[in-house]
Design a protein with these regions (language model features):
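Active-site-adjacent structural elements that line small-molecule/cofactor binding pockets in enzymes
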Residues: 1-296
Length: 296
């Protein structure tokens, strides 16, 4: 399987949603059809303990006509490289130009739960990419080839993304990281950070939702190390993050204010931003429509 497939035109923004993997299939079908009707061209989703990544992709693609499914990310510990190449080719052949395979090394606790050893994640990813590239697929090939991107935060994974794949998908990052990532990648590779947002102007309510979202991530070494690299200190990362950390990671305010943060990522070098709306609703369609009106 090739690793240099061209990224389709996904527009400047897409929808990033955990609910695509943890809500019932009928609700997912209705939601992605609504995303497409609003003008979004990409639906992003993770892979952890919810619906499996390739199954989720097929669900999204079968319920829409133009929307792309982008794994953000497919966990490389969840399947061997041959299985990943087979699944990607099958999706790319069935829905040409509408699937992007984002791959990631996950996190030590999740890897341990699967019985793996997280000791050398960069080497693991490098080996995985080589084995995907060498995989033999006996079915009809995807045309165009399925593009591959990497979840990348630190300089070494960003360099690997630039040298071996189509680009990078940083998650849980401020705008400052997008500038750093673009410099590390160079001008060619695709850069698509995720941006969590709360469309609410009350600081207390907005930060409450933000901290609920952030608290688990701030216990994971990968995200903590990245924020420490960016200049925060350990104390600022405790208890769901200081106000300054919260405000850097989660954009909040009215739709105009939130849209401005997305534009800052684009100005900093992003080609595309996956917008994750934090809400009590699984699919906050009104907020997504308000942002679509301002960004699409």
């Amino acid at each position: 399987m090739r690793l240099d497939g061209q990224i389709p035109d996904l527009g400047r923004v897409g929808v990033w949603s955990w609910s695509l993997v943890d809500q019932p299939a009928p609700q997912v079908r209705r939601a992605v059809a609504a995303f497409e009707a609003m003008g979004y061209r990409a639906a992003w989703f993770p892979e952890s303990r919810g619906r499996e990544a390739f199954t989720t992709s097929a669900l999204i693609l079968s319920a829409t006509e133009r929307l792309a499914a982008v794994t953000g990310i497919a966990n490389i510990w969840a399947r061997d490289p041959d299985a990943a190449a087979s699944g990607a080719n099958a999706l790319g052949e069935a829905w040409p130009g509408r699937f992007v395979l984002g791959l990631g090394v996950s996190h030590a606790p999740s890897v341990a739960r699967r019985g793996g050893d997280y000791a050398r994640p960069l080497a693991k990813m490098r080996d995985y990419l080589g084995r995907i590239e060498g995989a033999t697929f006996m079915g009809p090939p995807a045309d165009p080839p399925v593009p591959v991107i990497l979840a990348a935060l630190g300089p070494q994974m960003l360099r690997l993304a630039a040298s071996r794949t189509g680009g990078a998908h940083p998650y849980f990052v401020p705008v400052e990281h997008t500038r750093i990532a673009r410099e590390a990648l160079g001008s060619g590779p695709w850069l698509a950070p995720e941006q969590a947002v709360v469309v609410a102007s009350d600081p207390g309510r907005a930060r409450e939702l933000a901290r609920k979202h952030m608290s688990g991530y701030l216990r994971l070494d990968n995200y903590r190390r990245n924020l420490l690299r960016l200049g925060w200190n350990e104390a600022e990362l405790e208890d769901g993050g200081s106000d300054a950390v919260v405000d850097a990671i989660v954009a909040w305010g009215d739709a105009d204010t939130v849209a401005e943060r997305i534009r800052q990522h684009l100005a900093a070098g992003a080609d595309h931003v996956g917008i994750q709306v934090l809400s009590d609703e699984p699919f906050p369609l009104n907020d997504l429509e308000a942002l679509a009106d301002r960004l699409l």
